[in-house]
Design a protein with these regions (language model features):
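Long, non-globular segments of proteins
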Residues: 1-215
Length: 215
């Protein structure tokens, strides 16, 4: 394995002892660490709506059992892309490669979940995602926030390779909830957002991407 893969938490566990676990979802069978070909291993992951990453077959998914190593998380999500490998594309729509290692990902919602806001080096805030701190962050764009009417969740632009849009964690969305203005009535998505002394008109540009993603 390349160094990045050899040092991953899963790879370390594989070397320490057998962790091959058979998973059988309806119509789906896989084994963590399976070898579909010489020199190739496959692992399967799940991302919840709080931005926590787990091995897909972890029975109890909570803060204790999620991955927390920033180096691993950063590498995993920096290399995340649509799964066009020809394997598990419907069940695991995203894939993070590390050399010949394939890391398949399915999500509760989207493969990017913004979890905290950080100060940026130029004074402009950053929005960090999936536990990566400043290593996984994009510039915060208040005017691009969007509430998706079908589920009431809040979204923000994300890296293009991961679909271009990410979910804002519910706790962070709740912190910002008082800043939204509903200029077209409470039954419609908000039209403006108050941030650091400025009203931002919400463009709604992400709504089309979200509808296509969830159709």
């Amino acid at each position: 394995w390349p160094r990045c893969c050899r040092g991953s938490p899963v790879a370390v566990a594989m070397r320490a002892g057998p962790v091959l676990r058979l998973c059988a979802h309806p119509g789906l069978r896989y084994r963590q660490g399976q070898r579909p070909g010489p020199g190739t291993r496959e692992y399967f992951y799940y991302l919840d709506h709080q931005g926590q990453l787990f091995l897909d077959d972890t029975k109890v998914k909570n803060f204790i059992t999620c991955f927390k190593d920033v180096g691993f998380l950063s590498f995993f999500f920096e290399h995340l892309q649509r799964n066009r490998s020809g394997r598990y594309e419907a069940e695991f729509p995203f894939l993070s490669r590390c050399g010949r290692e394939r890391n398949f990902l399915r999500c509760d919602d989207l493969p990017v979940v913004f979890t905290q806001i950080l100060p940026g080096p130029d004074g402009n805030p950053l929005l960090s995602y999936c536990g990566g701190g400043a290593r996984l962050a994009v510039p915060f764009q208040p005017g691009m926030l969007a509430v998706f009417p079908e589920n009431g969740r809040l979204y923000h632009p994300a890296p293009r390779r991961a679909g271009g849009v990410g979910l804002v964690r519910s706790a962070l969305a709740a912190e910002w909830s008082s800043g939204f203005q509903f200029g077209e009535g409470s039954e419609r998505p908000p039209t403006h957002f108050w941030w650091e002394g400025t009203w931002y008109r919400l463009s709604g540009e992400l709504l089309g991407i979200l509808r296509a993603e969830k159709s």
